[in-house]
Amino acid sequence: MCTAATYKTKDFYFGRTLDYEFSYGDEITITPRNFPFKFRHTSECNSHFAMIGMAHIADGYPLYYDAMNEKGLCMAGLNFVGNAVYFEPKNGKENIAQFEFIPYILSHCDSVLQARKKLENLNITNTQFSNKLPCAQLHWIISDRNESLTVESTNDGLKVYDNPVGVLTNNPPFDIQMFMLNNYMALSPKQPENNFGKSAELTTYSRGMGAIGLPGDLSSASRFAKVAFTKLNSVSGDSESESVNQFFHILGAVDQPRGCCEVKDGQYEITIYTSCCNADKGIYYYTTYENHQISAVCMHRENLDSDQLCRYPIQTGEQICYQN
């Protein structure tokens, strides 16, 4: 399971946690402008916007989990098991395989507005990357500094939702997640007043009581509410270090330590990595379960006119600063 969020100070930030019980071997991957995307059902794209993100490279192809392009458009795919449905290619539609969806949108679109137009005639197909890599059951968040969308392909077809909170987790479907936020409308970062009854002399006995009722478990619906509340009430300076620091704290609200989410005997879901993209500067920051030091890759330090992928292995192993 996973959580994605947006955040804006003077720059725009986007990122996600990837929570799972194992890794496929992920790399920070820059796809330059002239890398050929050979889409399965539509024309090959040999010139496009450059992008950077976390990907598994299979047969030289970047299978992105999350990424941003050089124009500041960001996108992430999150588990949507049991609800995601993809279709056979359809005549008259722009047919894009599930694994192509992120590079297709980020190759062609410089904003959510453009992405919205692309989605009007899009069909996400059930074409597998290979027999060893079947379709992942996902839904997606697409964001820029102005707005966010959630995209879900279900039995009812392709659904595109405005996402006013800039947050996505997993099940249930996005419209239900948004509806359930009604349960928390009374929560506040401020201390509560006694509205229980005039005859009951009630007082606060702890800080933070305005948010009593905010979920703390690791279920996707609870993570959605907790990160939405945390993000919407976050306060930070607008420098790069302050903004990045705050973003990691926002997603840290739903960090998964090993042992708290057992998926089968002896196997536990953990937060494998957390990412934070500065979409204005093209910098991809990340931490991993084993390494809490923030690492970064800047796409603009590479040759973005190349036709070859630029790959950086994840930095693992805890980095500890000894002071004596």
Predicted regions and their residues:
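Short, flexible loop/turn elements at secondary-structure junctions
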Residues: 18, 79, 144-146, 155, ...
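Short, surface-exposed beta-strand-loop junctions and turns on beta-sheet-rich folds
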Residues: 20-22, 81-83, 156-159, 166, ...
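C-terminus-biased signal that marks the final domain/tail of proteins
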Residues: 1-9, 13, 127-128, 135-136, ...
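Catalytic cofactor-binding cores of redox enzymes
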Residues: 121-159
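Proteins synthesized as precursors that undergo proteolytic processing into mature forms
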Residues: 92-128, 240-248
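A contiguous strand-loop segment
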Residues: 1-93, 126, 313-315, 321-324
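Beta-strand residues in well-ordered beta-sheet regions across diverse protein folds
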Residues: 15, 77, 151-152, 161, ...
